[in-house]
Design a protein with these regions (language model features):
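Short amphipathic alpha-helical elements of helix-turn-helix/winged-helix folds
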Residues: 9-17
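Phosphate/dinucleotide-binding and metal-coordinating scaffold of catalytic cores
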Residues: 2-5, 18, 24, 33-39, ...
Length: 214
């Protein structure tokens, strides 16, 4: 579903209301777009199918409200993706894939999209963690240091432990954003200490280099 102005207006109105509202109220709120009941119901049906909107009641008592996407995936692991100190979306680790949804507020604000992930209502599905997120994880010795200190090689878990992120993306397990501060120790800023206390990765510990005088 393309991000048509009326779609964004529906999400914005439901977000501001933050409660169930009737079709009649929505039509009045969206008078600028002159939607017919059938057109509005069709758009709402699509938003319901992609977990953006929830519905209650039936026939003349039907009401609509903004949906917290997480409510449909509570049994799965998920992390928040932060862009420029704003919650951009949610990355879920499903049983057979990774799924990313842009956050409703991020869409409503018409914020700048994450590279390679155009703003859209529908989720993105991946077999692996998408490259735009995975590239934040260091390689080589720095990756080994991070895995050793965090005691996990799971890239999904490692994302939330990063402090030295690339660009404007970061990852967190809660919606709370702590600007320019992290509770995780920076492995790059503590490199000497980490190498000294981890013999597994301190491969040069007992190396002696002899230099002969000429």
């Amino acid at each position: 579903m393309k991000l048509k102005p009326i779609i964004m207006a529906i999400l914005e109105e439901l977000h501001m209301e933050n409660k169930f509202v009737s079709l009649k109220i929505l039509i009045n709120k969206l008078d600028k777009y002159k939607p017919s009941p059938r057109t509005l119901q069709s758009i709402l049906k699509e938003l319901i199918e992609c977990n953006r909107v929830i519905v209650q009641g039936s026939a003349s008592t039907t009401e609509y409200a903004i949906n917290d996407v997480i409510s449909n995936y509570r049994r799965f692991e998920f992390i928040y993706v932060v862009k420029d100190n704003e919650i951009a979306g949610i990355l879920f680790k499903l049983s057979d894939r990774y799924r990313f949804y842009y956050d409703n507020e991020f869409l409503i604000n018409k914020s700048k999209p994450i590279p390679s992930l155009d703003l859209q209502i529908l989720p993105f599905d991946f077999n692996n963690i998408p490259a735009v997120f995975e590239e934040n994880i260091p390689e080589g010795i720095n990756r080994e240091i991070l895995e050793t200190t965090s005691r996990t090689a799971d890239e999904f878990q490692i994302l939330t432990m990063l402090e030295d992120n690339i660009g404007d993306l970061s990852f967190t397990k809660t919606r709370e954003i702590v600007k320019n501060k992290s509770s995780n120790p920076s492995y790059l800023s503590s490199l000497n200490e980490i190498l000294g206390s981890n013999p597994k990765i301190n491969v040069l510990k007992d190396l002696v280099v002899g230099i002969e005088d000429e």
